[in-house]
């Protein structure tokens, strides 16, 4: 490998790492205390002489924030001078709340939102429609009590539900396990 080829490879790797850091720092439009990196939806970033390609996975099919996230990522990367930018969507494997980073879970709790527990395990292939048991107890992010009740199946977004703590009487949002 020639020196210029090694330099070109290094330049591409530095551009890829820079693009990944910029894309990972974009805030989620629905949960602005979290970044796309915190949510774990940033799947892959490639860079070459022509520009950058970023792959993201929506938190669920039909996520209304996907278009805005894609635009925000593209705008930030273009503003950083990284050439042509393309943001693509990866639907497989589907996103899981297990992909939320520990830092993201701490940020949710600090914002008064109960982070999700472990996602239910599913077999690969089509998702069967079944009746499920009542949701598991969710700890209150304010006082830590497990004495909570779900008050609504949907919160500000479809991926959230609403709870109230019986111990401290605080209402709070919970991110559903997906």
Regions found by a protein language model. Give the residues of each.
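Domain-level signature for proteins that mediate thiol-based redox and metal-cofactor handling
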Residues: 1-178
């Amino acid at each position: 490998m020639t020196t210029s080829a090694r330099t070109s490879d290094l330049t591409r790797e530095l551009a890829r790492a820079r693009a990944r850091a910029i894309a990972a720092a974009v805030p989620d439009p629905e949960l602005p205390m979290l970044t796309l990196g915190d949510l774990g939806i940033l799947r892959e970033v490639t860079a070459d002489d022509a520009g950058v390609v970023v792959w993201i996975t929506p938190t669920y099919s039909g996520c209304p924030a996907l278009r805005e996230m894609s635009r925000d990522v593209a705008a930030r990367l273009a503003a950083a001078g990284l050439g042509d930018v393309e943001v693509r969507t990866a639907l497989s494997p589907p996103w899981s709340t297990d992909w939320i980073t520990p830092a993201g879970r701490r940020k949710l709790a600090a914002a008064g939102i109960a982070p999700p527990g472990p996602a239910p395990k599913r077999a690969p292939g089509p998702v069967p429609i079944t009746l499920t048991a009542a949701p598991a107890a969710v700890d209150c992010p304010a006082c830590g009590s497990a004495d909570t009740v779900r008050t609504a199946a949907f919160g500000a977004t479809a991926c959230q539900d609403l709870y109230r703590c019986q111990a401290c009487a605080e209402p709070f949002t919970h991110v559903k396990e997906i």
